[in-house]
């Protein structure tokens, strides 16, 4: 099984890439994290947020690994603790399907994609920069894995 983070947005600051890479490289070979950046749609010419999200959904769909479990990050998603994420990981691994975490663009995720998702998950009740979400998600995935392995990284 592989973990994918599909993120609408590109040209992130260097510290975002460094932070993401730090946690991604810590993951074990059997649970690698791959980042797939989706170029955002331009909001020009009077385009509505709905049309922008629909166009971004098409790009996300093209980048989704076939048969992957879709975890859409959304402010109205379920509010999991790190322990709940750690409890989900072994089941996902046994299932054998790749897991794709999807981070939307400035307008969020298209409702059709959210309706298809296996899980709607909220990273925080606070509004966060999209680049920061990549780093936080990678760290939480590493922390969840470390919990499943009784690794000393997580000290609760």
From Swiss-Prot:
GO molecular function (one)? rRNA (pseudouridine-N3-)-methyltransferase activity
What keyword terms does UniProt attach to this protein?
Answer: Cytoplasm, Methyltransferase, rRNA processing, S-adenosyl-L-methionine, Transferase
Signal peptide bounds: none
Per the record, the coiled-coil ranges are none
Query: Where on the tree of life does the source sit, at the highest rank?
Result: Bacteria
Residues crossing the lipid bilayer are none
For this protein, the record's Pfam families field holds:
SPOUT_MTase (PF02590)
Residues annotated to bind S-adenosyl-L-methionine = 73, 104, 123-128
User: One GO CC annotation, please?
Assistant: cytoplasm
Q: Where in the cell is it found?
A: Cytoplasm
Query: What's the Enzyme Commission number for this chain?
Result: 2.1.1.177
- Catalysed reaction equations from the record: pseudouridine(1915) in 23S rRNA + S-adenosyl-L-methionine = N(3)-methylpseudouridine(1915) in 23S rRNA + S-adenosyl-L-homocysteine + H(+)
According to its UniProt entry, the function of this protein is described as: Specifically methylates the pseudouridine at position 1915 (m3Psi1915) in 23S rRNA.
* UniProt subunit comment: Homodimer.
HAMAP family the record matches: 23SrRNA_methyltr_H (MF_00658)
Family of this protein: Belongs to the RNA methyltransferase RlmH family.
The protein's name: Ribosomal RNA large subunit methyltransferase H
Organism annotation: Burkholderia multivorans (strain ATCC 17616 / 249)
């Amino acid at each position: 099984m592989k973990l994918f983070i599909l993120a609408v947005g590109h040209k992130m600051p260097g510290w975002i890439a460094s932070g993401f890479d730090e946690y991604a490289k810590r993951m074990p070979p059997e649970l690698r994290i791959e980042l797939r950046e989706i170029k955002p749609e331009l909001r020009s010419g009077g385009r509505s947020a709905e049309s922008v999200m629909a166009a971004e959904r098409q790009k996300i769909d093209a980048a989704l690994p076939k048969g992957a479990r879709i975890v859409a990050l959304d402010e109205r998603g379920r509010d999991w603790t790190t322990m709940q994420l750690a409890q989900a990981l072994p089941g996902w691994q046994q299932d054998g399907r790749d897991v794709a975490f999807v981070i939307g663009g400035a307008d969020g995720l298209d409702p059709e994609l959210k309706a298809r998702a296996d899980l709607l998950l909220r990273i925080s009740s606070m509004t966060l920069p999209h680049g920061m979400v990549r780093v936080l998600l990678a760290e939480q995935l590493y922390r969840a894995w470390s919990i499943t392995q009784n690794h000393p990284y997580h000290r609760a």
